[in-house]
Amino acid sequence: MDRMLTFDDYRGIIRALRDPEKGCPWDRVQTHESLKPCMIHEMTEAVAAVDLLSETGDPDNLCEELGDVLLQVVLQSQIAEEEGLFSLDDVIRRAGEKMLRRHPHVFSSEASPEKEEIPGRWEAIKQAEKQGKSAEYERKKKEAEAAAAREVIRLLNAENQ
């Protein structure tokens, strides 16, 4: 490829993959549920790539694996948009708003804390945000964390064989 692809180009690629008539047969039938194992798998590969970067200094694997994680975010967002739930722009907006809220020492007049204090402040802000979340959401989150742990164990076992 001779030209640099932009983020909008990438979004267009994902839309084309999901096109009901011309898209990829595999991508067209994916759902939020069917992609859950892929999301876990790609995150574990990204974590492994971070370890590899630390060990070797070679960034190529991390760059590739972050692209795979990005695919999961954009593909899940595309499916949600098709279902009328939310769009990738909504995901980006909400993620940005969260960063603004959780970094008042950067984005408001609040004094900058010592770096050791930041995780505690982050957690306090997160807990305040959680007040509106349901117990069902928290239960589902714990189930997802357990599924992710099982996938990591499976990958480690496969790697050691």
What are these regions (language model features)?
Residues M1-E65, L71-Q161:
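Flexible "arm" and connector segments at domain edges
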